[in-house]
From Swiss-Prot:
NCBIfam families: PRK09200.1, PRK12904.1, secA. It comes from Endomicrobium trichonymphae. The gene is secA. It is found in: Cell membrane; Cytoplasm. The lineage of its organism: Bacteria, Pseudomonadati, Elusimicrobiota, Endomicrobiia, Endomicrobiales. This is Protein translocase subunit SecA. Its cofactor is Zn(2+).
Amino acid sequence: MLKTILVAIFGSQNDRDIKAIQPVIEKINALEPYIKKLTDVELKEKTVEFRERLSKGETLDDVLPEAFACVREASVRTIGLRHFDVQLIGGYILHKGKIAEMKTGEGKTLVATLAAYLNALPQTGVHIVTVNDYLAKRDKEWMGVVYEKLGLTVGNVGNETKNEERRMAYNCDITYITNNEIGFDYLRDNMVIAKDDRVLRPLNYAIIDEVDSILIDEARTPLIISGACAESTDKYYISDRIVPRLKGRIITENEEIKAKYADVDLAKGYDYLIDEKNHSAVLTEQGVQKAEKMLGVKNIYDDLQSEWVHHLTQAIKAHNLYRRDIEYVVKDGKVIIVDEFTGRLMPGRRWSDGLHQSIEVKENLKIADENQTLATITFQNFFRMYKKIAGMTGTATTESEEFWEIYKLGVIEVPTNNPMIRKDYHDVIYRTEREKDNAVVNEIESLWKKGQPVLVGTRSIEKSEKISTMLRIKGIPHQVLNAKYHELEAQIIAGAGTKSAVTIATNMAGRGTDILLGAGDAVQNEEVKKSGGLHIIGTERHESRRIDNQLRGRSGRQGDPGSSKFFLSMEDELMRLFGSDKMSVIMQKLGLKENEDIQHLWISKAVENAQKKVEGMNFDIRKRLIDFDNVMNKQREAVYKLRNEILEGQDITDTIKDMISESIEEKITAWAVGKYTEEWDWASIDVWLLRTFGIKYETGNKDEISNLSRESARSAISGKVFEAYEHRKEQLTPELMLNMQRIVLLQMIDSSWRDHLYELDQLRHDIGFRAYAQKDPKVEYQKESFALFESMMNRVRDNTIEYIFKVQIDAKLQKMAIQTTNSDFRKNDGKKINKGSNKIGRNDQCPCGSGKKFKKCCGA
């Protein structure tokens, strides 16, 4: 109550933020008459002037008013669009590294030109990131002429863009790109052997279109570059045959709570339990015993048989949680994932941890190879590497807490240019899905007859096809949009506002394309407005309020009339899993007849509360994901930093010598144990020296060293080894030796990092079981992943040393080394890597990701 009174008196924080920007907008508007008088040449020369001012110490904020005024004028002269004041506000918010929430149709694409131009002036690159290739290409072609009018270069990177073209596009002042393409380019850049194969510049500033979709919806799925992993597929087939013979039970949250208070064992009489809400499966004690008997093993949880638990659990999930034509489709003999947020097919994407293979077996398809991760990163950690990011979307307020907590991005809601007059009706709820579907079709028929356009949003391809079939039976013409082709998708969605148009779309198919009433025809536009504008029908509530708001937002753009209504049933997934028991009881007590519905604010509120509950759960999942990925991120940064130093052509001789000294120290410490030298393990030292460095001691030499102290012995061995190193250098020539070292070290880093990622995958899969031992899985993961990382770095060191002394330089390697010498080393004047040792100093930050010093964390 107090908060409401304070807002009424002082305005909301958002109102105050907008008010604070107004003086800047007034400055921009005051400059408009002056900028209008400039010739095209003078307008273009403004860019040169701004860059000179920046070089003399002015800031981007200093040149912002004039720069924005120039962009506005360039837009008028090229594409005939003048930025409204609210769009200038949006551009200012983007420049300040925040999220501008702008309703559908408010011109977000045009808004981006303001901040993009300003931040491109320092010539460090601006990326405008969007969700698909079609939008990236369309926006580059549409807005590119504005930038070119001002003397900037513009590029676009798509799925088919070749390497050299990518490099050129990224070297442009402004680059239009999808989130997937730039993420994969970053990973690929950190896998190359030659510096010239990299395509990206350092990450400077990104404007993320549909920022909620990229930073939240897709945050649970990491980008992964993978390769085939040789593994037997027998266990998938055996597990698939066992699961149908097991008895399972799907449990709801309410059942779980009631069972807990009543002390009832839900697992009794069942072999496995399915938690549909959390998308998880677990074998019961009875199920474990039955599975062990069928498999003929004593204990499926011991080290040798533990993979059986994993394979059986994945098979259970494949049979119970993943449904054909909802979570995936089968096309051309392949299982193709359906994006749960957009309904789009995602060819080439695969579920990990063997789940995809389990589904392939379930569908009697040829099983594909298990994938091994070669490089991976989450969008959370990727976009946090930019110096500055900003975002645009029509729906960000509901996720403002997450944007701030994960990305430190504030959200400011930009006022609409014209008042919003769309009417949003209360939800209507039916007992069964059948009754709800009938009501949806009847509503469509009624609106179609009066000429009002209708956009029907569904959550799955299956649901789209079901509604489509019912409309065909009634003879109602319509378009079905299952989001398979982005360009076709845009064309269909653009026509969804024409008279009597009926369009069925999965979730946010066609997002990014405006729906114009009458499709731009003035006469038809008036007719459609008189009929009530575009009517939105939601056939089910999504887990996230934001997705529902996105659907609603397709109607009522730029002050147009419109309306929206959601149709629900007690059989909908959200209601079934998260709806309260009270709602079910009320529905029963009301004694509703066939096809009767309830409409009430209380019901809409109950649904919203259920959605808030799911949003909270999903937020926790994403936070857990980033907690674990932060551990890997510190290690990834360390490895990629070393890789880049090597690629930059810096002299790594000191690094190699440090590795050799470290290795000698480690071996002497391990084998020179005992008070007397006679007690030392000379046999192991001999074998190691011969195997690694090709050094063979004669008996006399050994006797001589045996009489020395440990320090003297270490010094003597080091002398022999470095003598052999210098001899190796003379054999090859210093230039060839230098570049052979670089090539070998890169290959050792890559192969060891690949193995390390596999080990981390396994660790992460198993770490959850530590909770049963009253241990925090996150803390355990930090400690063990650090131990694995240190072990990996030791492997890199030992393998690199051995290869340097043993590798045979064939013609191909020699040519490669010489080319590297000419192109890299001489260009960089033989700079040395500032690196003393592979070991972590006690006062260094711990690579586990805790943020603590090593001595206070894993090194304690």
